[in-house]
A protein has these predicted regions:
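Conserved beta-sheet core of the metallophosphoesterase superfamily
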Residues: 165-242
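Short acidic, glycine-rich surface-loop motifs adjacent to enzyme active sites
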Residues: 143-161
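A short C-terminal boundary segment appended to hydrolase-like catalytic domains
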Residues: 238-295
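Active-site neighborhood of phospho(di)ester-bond hydrolases with catalytic His/Asp-centered motifs
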Residues: 7-8, 34-40, 66-73, 115, ...
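Beta-strand-turn-beta hairpins that frame and shape the catalytic cleft
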Residues: 1-5, 102-113, 143-147, 208-213
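Extended active-site neighborhood of metal-dependent phosphoesterases/phosphodiesterases
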Residues: 51-137, 180, 207, 235
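N-terminal active-site segment of His-dependent metallophosphoesterases
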Residues: 1-59, 79, 100
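Active-site environment of divalent metal-dependent phosphoester hydrolases
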Residues: 13-18, 43-47, 70-81, 119-123, ...
Length: 295
């Protein structure tokens, strides 16, 4: 079993220090095989915010925790126009990582992160053709029994984001991106951006989308909440490429604790899900099914 912690939208500069400390302690105690951070490490891409994010990440690395980190749209300067258009991810590269499309592989999983942040948009993201070619190339030599995981900040598909039924935009070049993910044989796609937890089978979101399970993370440490959904992150146990467990670990105001626990299995009809534990009882998640999308 491969244990993966999936955090997103840390937003240093608009963070709660108590929650940052609690998340660090949680990770150090459980020691995941890999910690994935799917973008928006900072609130406004300021140097002081990158230094805060870097210090936190470096403490995890110093403790021996492997990490795979990608930028988000908030890691591109918004008001500093010179850097926004000429060097959009210069500070990210200086303080976090030079690698914008990191790759991780062990005996059980292969994981690729792709940068969807762009300087010409405020909040939207996209993938370019070179990244789609990289997606295909990286996974081409991967053994078929390994679980293939794609990480982006912006989700490949439109997602429900509001209580009134509002839906987000899909990532730019959506059709080509979905085709590339399908051809690469992606089993799980992790993303963030909307500060909402969500999971749904790709094949139920678009025709010819392939067999991936789409998993969204909420904001792990930010005070910027959507629909009063509390801070949270995902805790995945990957048994095989066709069987995973997903726990949503939720901040209850004093500590992180399990908010939901769902097992997913891929059968002939697609992904099926069932609750391993009772549905969430915390904050805005109360009373909702533990998997937020129909699977």
């Amino acid at each position: 079993v491969t244990r993966i912690a999936h955090l997103s939208d840390l937003h240093f500069g608009a963070h709660d220090e108590r929650i940052v400390t609690a998340a660090e302690a949680w990770l150090l105690e459980r020691r995941p095989h890999l910690t994935v951070i799917s973008g928006d490490l900072t609130q406004r891409a300021r140097i002081v915010q990158f230094r805060q994010a870097s210090a936190w990440i470096n403490r995890l690395r110093a403790a021996g925790l492997p990490l795979l980190v990608i930028p988000g749209n908030h890691d591109v300067p918004l008001y500093d126009l010179a850097n926004r258009f000429l060097r959009p991810l210069h500070r990210y590269k200086r303080y976090i990582s030079n690698e914008l499309c990191p790759f991780y592989e062990d005996e059980a999983v292969a994981i690729l992160g792709l940068n969807t942040a762009r300087s010409l948009t405020i909040k939207d993201g996209r993938l370019n053709q070179a990244q789609m070619a990289l997606l295909r190339a990286r996974f081409a030599p991967v053994a078929p029994e390994k679980t293939r995981i794609l990480v982006t900040h912006h989700p490949l598909f439109a997602m429900p984001i509001g209580k009134g039924g509002e839906w987000s935009e899909a990532v730019g070049r959506h059709d080509d991106a979905v085709k590339a993910a399908r051809e690469a044989g992606i089993h799980i796609a992790l993303a963030g951006h909307f500060h909402r937890t969500y999971a749904q089978a790709a094949q139920e979101m678009a025709e010819d989308a392939g067999g991936a399970l789409m998993i969204q993370a909420g904001t792990a440490t930010s005070t910027r909440l959507r629909n009063a959904e509390p801070q949270s992150f995902n805790w995945l146990h990957v048994h095989r490429h066709d069987r995973i467990e997903l726990q949503v670990v939720v901040w209850d105001g004093a500590a992180f604790r399990r908010g939901s626990h769902v097992e997913y299995a891929f059968r002939f009809a697609g992904w099926q899900a069932w609750n391993v534990a009772d549905p969430p009882t915390i904050g805005a998640l109360a009373g909702q099914p533990a998997h937020h999308g129909a699977v």
